[in-house]
Amino acid sequence: MKALAKLERAPGLTLTRVKKPEVGHNDVMIRITRTAICGTDIHIWKWDDWAQKTIPVPMHVGHEYVGEIVEMGQEVRGFSIGDRVSGEGHITCGFCRNCRAGRRHLCRNTVGVGVNREGAFAEYLVIPAFNAFKIPPEISDDLAAIFDPFGNATHTALSFNLVGEDVLITGAGPIGIMAVAIAKHVGARNVVITDVNDYRLELARKMGATRAVNVSRETLRDVMRDLHMTEGFDVGLEMSGVPSAFTSMLEAMNHGGKIALLGIPPAQTAIDWTQVIFKGLEIKGIYGREMFETWYKMVAMLQSGLDLSPILTHRFAVDDYEKAFATMLSGESGKVILDWTV
């Protein structure tokens, strides 16, 4: 079958032919129709330090997808041939304490689709049936293909009550931009997002941001004054992994504020801990998606009017994958979709 793979320990990916995967007793085989390019795939493309330490070679990658079930193992229940599905990319052990307590997103033995095992940038993908998630007919293939990052945004944004709150989001990547729409959808008052990328800040405005701030030209203090915010932000969502962004967030938080961290900063990042201690801030690390509460919330929000369509900015046939990755690398895109049906 056709697949987009890392064949060499060097930058780039290669469109190649690989063996079609086999289906185990508890697995489903999905014929892929759409995939999306993730920031993780960009790390793999660039072959940076993280990728060199993490990604087996050779292996086809990718973990944002939608498709149709074409084969099932004999033990699979609850699915039918022809079901349209996406899937949870974190395959968990089912036996550790967190898994047995229903906290599978915290499994210490997680294996990532397209990271630690063969991925979705291929004509067919096999995953455990437990990880598959049915997509309602009213949700498009393009939207279903981004349920993985949409889930990251949902898990992060809904970690705290947002109704009537002032929310600061640092980092206007696709996940941060989707978090803007989620926060507004569930009732946040002011939603402010910061970055230095004007293209993506404009996308955030289209998604409902109260203010989209280029911090190279404008300060948060000035924005807060314009919005008549005298005490600070109630909730912070750190999506960038940039130390200076986290520092500015800490300074802008109200006493008793709550912060969810999804962005991954450098290992030895220093912060002013007095901001955390004296303000009584609550900080929560976020990893992946809650299985499968986050997925149900994603569907419910889309069915109740959440509009993510502005984030879907570019579409390419898979044969044009180099153009697709170049578009993502340019920084002037939202989510980039690869079509496996043409």
UniProtKB/Swiss-Prot annotation:
Name where it's found: Cytoplasm
EC identifiers of the protein = 1.1.1.103
MF GO annotations: L-threonine 3-dehydrogenase activity; zinc ion binding
Q: Where does Zn(2+) 2 bind?
A: 93, 96, 99, 107
Pathway membership? Amino-acid degradation; L-threonine degradation via oxydo-reductase pathway; glycine from L-threonine: step 1/2
Q: Which amino acid positions bind NAD(+), per UniProt?
A: 175, 195, 200, 262-264, 286-287
Q: Which reaction equation describes what this protein catalyses?
A: L-threonine + NAD(+) = (2S)-2-amino-3-oxobutanoate + NADH + H(+)
The cysteines joined by S-S bonds are none
State where it is primarily located. cytoplasm
Q: Where along the chain is the active site annotated? A: 40, 43
Where is the site described as Important for catalytic activity for the proton relay mechanism but does not participate directly in the coordination of zinc atom found in this chain?
Answer: 148
Report the cofactors: Zn(2+)
- Domain of life, per lineage: Bacteria
Q: PROSITE patterns, alphabetically?
A: ADH_ZINC
Q: Which UniProt keywords apply?
A: Cytoplasm, Metal-binding, NAD, Oxidoreductase, Zinc
Q: Quick one: a GO biological-process term for this protein?
A: L-threonine catabolic process to glycine
Where along the chain is Zn(2+) 1 bound?
38, 63-64
Q: Name one GO cellular component term.
A: cytoplasm
Question: Is the keyword Zinc in the record?
Answer: yes
Q: Tell me the Pfam families matching this sequence.
A: ADH_N, ADH_zinc_N
The entry's free-text remark on the cofactor is: Binds 2 Zn(2+) ions per subunit.
| Family of the protein in this entry | Belongs to the zinc-containing alcohol dehydrogenase family.
Q: How does this chain assemble? A: Homotetramer.
The role this protein plays is: Catalyzes the NAD(+)-dependent oxidation of L-threonine to 2-amino-3-ketobutyrate.
NCBIfam families found in the cross-reference section:
PRK05396.1, tdh
Q: What is this protein called?
A: L-threonine 3-dehydrogenase
The record lists the organism as: Paraburkholderia phymatum (strain DSM 17167 / CIP 108236 / LMG 21445 / STM815) (Burkholderia phymatum)
State the organism's lineage. Answer: Bacteria, Pseudomonadati, Pseudomonadota, Betaproteobacteria, Burkholderiales
**Gene field:** tdh
